[in-house]
Amino acid sequence: MKLPALLTLGVAASTMVLAAIAPDQVPLNDAKKDELPEKFLIELAPGDTRWVTEDEKWELKREGLKFFDITAEVEQGFLPKVFPTPAVVNFPSELNRTAEVKQLASQLSKENMFNHLTNFTSFHTRYYKSTAGTQSATWLFEQVQQTVNNSLAVKYGAKVETFNHSWSQFSIIASIPGRTNKTVVVGAHQDSINMYLPTIMAAPGADDDGSGTVTILEALRVLLQSDAVAQGNATNTIEFHWYSAEEAGLLGSQAVFSKYKNENRDIKSMLQQDMTGYSQGTLDAGEQESVGVITDYVHSGLTEFIMKVVTGYCDIPFVLTKCGYACSDHASASRYGYPSAFVIESKFEHSSQRIHTMWDTVEYLDFDHMLQHAKMTLGLVYELAFAEL
């Protein structure tokens, strides 16, 4: 996600490094001084590519720039058409499952999200190349597995799998079979980063994107309380994704959707939940609490349906906002031709300024606001699960 506007945090961070380093934490990739640093090909806009080191990646992010890391695509000799026209999907013109969704939504728990996020942010960092990042992914996998195992769905083919990468932190995919292979996807990214010293400094990542991670986990838990969904009677298959290495250039989600494209997977929609917990920026601006519906680099039909979902199932309105190129994992779905959308906690300019620092902690989040994102996620998935797409 974006760079905190308060760059003075960087000065403060540099004076607090020793306090933020875990006792047994050592810098990663401690290469010899005479070795040239590894370089990566990034894309900052359609056709705008450059080779950079990993340190240069973080410098670009500190400047507020977002990008795809497309190194793997080049190495494989394949580059997708940038934002190809997605397959035509006829999203519903109205909400059709109001009674079921509202009954399920009453079971969503702020306490569950708080408890999960408190545990998830207790890892020193969730940096994708770190030991702690692998440990946090393992903890999250166990929570997702337990959520599925505690439902009827486990008896009807639901499963949770790791999606392994060339780096240590894996992505996680929970699948709930439907009557067809047409698939509805919800995603969040599980990794975190401290933009000042990524390999050693604390990166609790409560809002970015611990909030989205636990929001969709809670939506999954409640969704599986539906016997129709759990028993595989929904029209469409449902997947929940937790991506690794979003902060490094959408690496995890690109790997997932590249594989899906090669397998000719029929992905009908993808919603990203990245930063769902901060409302104070909106209130401080004197504006009404709302969720931010992203309008750039997204699928217009899916986005329009999401507006209906927010209006029908949330207690607060939506505002339209933009986040730029490659701003979160939905962009990877779009890159491979799949309809995608993104809903964030507020107007982009009012979102948290503490992200990518040691101060992105649970105490600054609003779990009532996260509950609205959980309602929206649940409503969208349930509606689309039973829709003829």
Curated annotation (Swiss-Prot):
Residues carrying covalently attached carbohydrate according to the record: 96, 119, 149, 164, 181, 233
Annotated disulfide bonds: 323-327
Cofactor stoichiometry and binding remark: Binds 2 Zn(2+) ions per subunit.
Cross-referenced SUPFAM superfamilies: Zn-dependent exopeptidases
Residues annotated for Zn(2+) 2 binding in this entry: 208, 247, 356
Pfam families: Peptidase_M28
Positions of the propeptide removed during maturation: 20-88
GO terms under cellular component: extracellular region
Enzyme nomenclature, EC number: 3.4.11.-
A GO biological process held by the record: proteolysis
Cofactor(s) needed for function: Zn(2+)
Signal sequence, renumbered to the chain: 1-19
Primary location recorded for the protein, binned into one broad class: secreted
GO molecular function: aminopeptidase activity; metal ion binding; metalloexopeptidase activity
Annotated positions binding Zn(2+) 1: 189, 208, 274
Subcellular location: Secreted
UniProt keyword terms in alphabetical order: Aminopeptidase, Disulfide bond, Glycoprotein, Hydrolase, Metal-binding, Protease, Secreted, Signal, Zinc, Zymogen
Family matches, as InterPro entries: M28_fam (IPR045175), Peptidase_M28 (IPR007484)
Similarity section: Belongs to the peptidase M28 family. M28E subfamily.
Function: Extracellular aminopeptidase that allows assimilation of proteinaceous substrates.
Oligomer and partners: Monomer.
Protein name, per record: Leucine aminopeptidase 1
Species classification: Eukaryota, Fungi, Dikarya, Ascomycota, Pezizomycotina
Name of the encoding gene: LAP1
